[in-house]
């Protein structure tokens, strides 16, 4: 508990990361590369599908960190300033995501049915789902995200040096501009990478569904890193309060409910309408062994996080909150896996070493890029005009 009013904050500087962490990230990256090469030799189709699962999960973390940062700027939230540099760091993965998209292009014929030849009579849809056009717009979208991250987070980093209050106003304006851009661009990339796996199927709720999963899991990741940085005299230990922990827990709880609402709404509407061109999506994903994963998703995405975070005390208990965050990560991976794999694999028959190995590769690259950001810049925006207000946040105590 922090009972005294904070009147001055020393700059903790960049994160000093133990060498074992960096070595862990390098090893994970190497494991991923070796696993991908071996997987391509064993089953190229499955390898590229697993690549897409891991790619989309970490892409969501990257843009999710940017979205969370921009959202807090846009609404002028002061309590979250202590955590802002944590969320900003996640966007450091976006340049790597742009490069890793080349893998999606290389494996496109193994991933997307429409990449193997014309599938549509509609000339507009035929042009929309052509590999050059899909790759061009998706990479352009990631470039746009990188540009907004450079502007919004760049203002905050410059403010660390100058203390210019007007930089906050500029960050707010750019964040507001980013909101509609994000909504449109994330919808497009969700359609291109996931919904187009079954090109004759569509859902008007699909982009909201992928957004809900993205935001729930991203806030869980932000919370996990934040709690790690504030424990054992970490760099955030002197400014982080139980109220920050409680508010992040409340965010997770709220978007667990939102995720469930959207997921149920999509299922209920398709089930009730009972139109063959829509029900095929769930038919593929609730038979031939996939039903077990279908039934597991509510457990990891709703039941465990919801009841685990239902009490006020649970949201402020750090070890418990960290455990819930891990459960949400597992749920997010299983959800994306369930969205991707049944489109090309009729029977649920996971190749565990392939899934874990390729995922570790992406986790390693993500860890290297994000930790590099934390190691270069201060983990606190100490000259932000709302910094002291955030450090004195005591709403839930």
PLM ranges: what are they?
Residues 48, 56-161, 178:
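Transmembrane-helix bundle segments that line or gate the permeation/cavity pathway
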Residues 1-36, 112-128, 153-171, 234-243, ...:
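Extramembrane terminal tails and long inter-domain/linker segments of multi-pass membrane proteins
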Residues 18-34, 128-297, 384:
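Long, contiguous internal "core" modules enriched in hydrophobic/ aromatic residues
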Residues 26-45, 64-67, 104-110, 149-153, ...:
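Alpha-helical transmembrane segments of multi-pass membrane proteins
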Residues 4, 21, 118, 300-304, ...:
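TerminUS-proximal long segments
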Residues 48-55, 83-85, 198-211, 283, ...:
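Non-cytosolic membrane-interface motifs at loop->transmembrane helix junctions
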Residues 60-70, 99-103, 138-150, 212-227, ...:
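Hydrophobic cores of alpha-helical transmembrane segments in multi-pass inner/ER membrane proteins
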């Amino acid at each position: 508990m922090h009972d005294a009013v904070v009147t001055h904050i020393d700059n903790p500087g960049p994160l000093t990361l133990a060498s074992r962490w960096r070595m862990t990230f390098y090893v994970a990256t190497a494991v991923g590369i070796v696993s991908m090469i071996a997987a391509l030799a064993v089953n190229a189709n499955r390898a590229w599908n697993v690549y897409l699962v891991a790619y989309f999960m970490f892409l969501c973390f990257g843009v999710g960190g940017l979205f969370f940062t921009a959202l807090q700027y846009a609404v002028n939230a002061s309590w979250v300033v202590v955590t802002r540099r944590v969320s900003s760091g996640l966007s450091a993965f976006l340049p790597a995501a742009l490069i890793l998209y080349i893998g999606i292009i290389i494996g496109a014929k193994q991933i997307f049915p429409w990449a193997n030849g014309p599938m549509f009579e509609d000339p507009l849809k035929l042009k929309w789902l052509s590999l050059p056009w899909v790759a061009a717009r998706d990479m352009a979208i990631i470039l746009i995200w990188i540009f907004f991250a450079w502007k919004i987070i760049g203002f905050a980093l410059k403010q660390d040096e100058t203390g210019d209050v007007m930089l906050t106003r500029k960050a707010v304006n750019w964040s507001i501009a980013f909101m509609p851009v994000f909504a449109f661009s994330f919808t497009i990339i969700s359609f291109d990478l996931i919904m187009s796996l079954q090109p004759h199927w569509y859902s008007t709720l699909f982009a909201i569904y992928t957004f809900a999963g993205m935001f729930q899991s991203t806030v869980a990741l932000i919370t996990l890193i934040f709690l790690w940085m504030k424990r054992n005299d970490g760099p955030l230990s002197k400014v982080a309060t139980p109220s920050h922990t409680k508010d992040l827990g409340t965010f997770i709880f709220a978007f667990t409910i939102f995720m469930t609402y959207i997921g149920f709404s999509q299922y209920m509407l398709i089930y009730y309408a009972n139109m063959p061109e829509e029900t095929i999506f769930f038919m593929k994903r609730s038979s031939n062994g996939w039903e077990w994963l279908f039934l597991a998703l509510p457990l990891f995405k709703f039941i465990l996080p919801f009841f685990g975070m239902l009490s006020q005390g649970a949201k402020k208990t750090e070890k418990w909150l960290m455990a819930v965050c891990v459960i949400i990560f597992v749920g997010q991976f299983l959800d994306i896996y369930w969205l991707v794999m049944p489109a090309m694999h009729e029977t649920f028959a996971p190749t565990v070493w392939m899934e874990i190995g390729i995922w570790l590769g992406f986790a390693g690259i993500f860890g290297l890029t994000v930790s590099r950001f934390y190691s270069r810049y201060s983990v606190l925006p100490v000259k932000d005009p709302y910094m002291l207000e955030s450090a004195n946040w005591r709403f839930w105590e």
